[in-house]
Design a protein with these regions (language model features):
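N-terminal nucleotide-binding beta1-loop-alpha1 segment
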Residues: 1-17, 23
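Structural signal for short hydrophobic segments within the conserved structured cores
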Residues: 24, 69-71, 180
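Conserved N-terminal catalytic core of the sugar/cofactor nucleotidyltransferase
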Residues: 31-97, 110-111, 151
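Short aromatic-hydrophobic micro-motifs that form the base-stacking/packing surface
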Residues: 99-101
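Short acidic donor-binding/metal-coordinating loop in glycosyltransferase active sites
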Residues: 103-105
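Conserved core of the sugar-phosphate nucleotidyltransferase
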Residues: 108-193
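C-terminal catalytic/acceptor-binding lobe
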Residues: 191-202
Length: 202
């Protein structure tokens, strides 16, 4: 089975707003709702699960009202939460495919999600990480946290439902939609100008 796991339990302190980051709004729509709508337009994702934590109780209530299944995590750090999620899935099956996507990536549409999954299956590897060139960030006036050899990791990864180090392939996509990871108010300001370009129906 192919799952989307939306990572929605981070603290989001850099955004410097009283609102939990997944519920921060672009054009009166929460970031996580953009992500969920995009996942729902995917032809390959079969089920969506939201990973929440004590850091984001209002986000948990929001997605529960939308009838999504919740997976509680400690919310201490990404890798710790990831391991816990993989363990949870591994108990049921070691053959599931899990697409992890951060709740602050509003512009990654279903067709892009499907492209990433198709490249993952084509690779024959257990895991796939998605990266975009630094030049995409620079052209948009967006900041990034980390780069290696001119590439920046995007918050979209694919893994098998096994809690172990997995043989990974890297997918480089030169699409500006993937660069909009809303971490700061500056990111949100830039994203605000592009909302209608990437989301015709808000």
């Amino acid at each position: 089975m192919i799952y989307a796991v939306v990572m929605a339990g981070g603290r989001g302190t850099r955004l410097e707003t009283p609102v939990e980051k997944p519920l921060f709004k672009l054009h009166n729509k929460p970031l996580i709702k953009y992500v969920l709508d995009n996942i729902n337009s995917s032809k390959l994702i079969e089920k969506t699960i939201i990973a929440t934590s004590p850091n984001a109780p209002e986000t948990e209530e929001y997605v529960k009202k939308l009838n999504y299944e919740i997976l509680d995590t400690p919310g201490v750090d990404y890798l710790n939460d990831l391991s816990l999620i993989l363990k949870s899935f591994e108990k049921k099956s070691t053959e599931d495919t899990l697409l992890f996507i951060n709740a602050d990536l509003p512009f990654i549409k279903g067709e892009c999600i499907d492209y990433i999954l198709k490249q993952y299956f084509k690779s024959g590897k257990e895991a796939l990480s998605t990266l975009i060139p630094v030049t995409v960030f620079n052209d948009l006036g967006l900041k990034y946290e980390y780069e290696y050899q001119g590439l920046v990791p995007v918050g979209v990864n694919v893994l098998k439902s096994i809690d172990k180090i997995q043989d990974e392939t890297q997918l480089v996509i030169e699409k500006e939609e993937l660069a909009f990871n809303i971490n700061t108010l500056q990111d949100a300001s830039v994203a605000d100008k592009y909302t209608f370009k990437y989301n015709e129906c808000i």
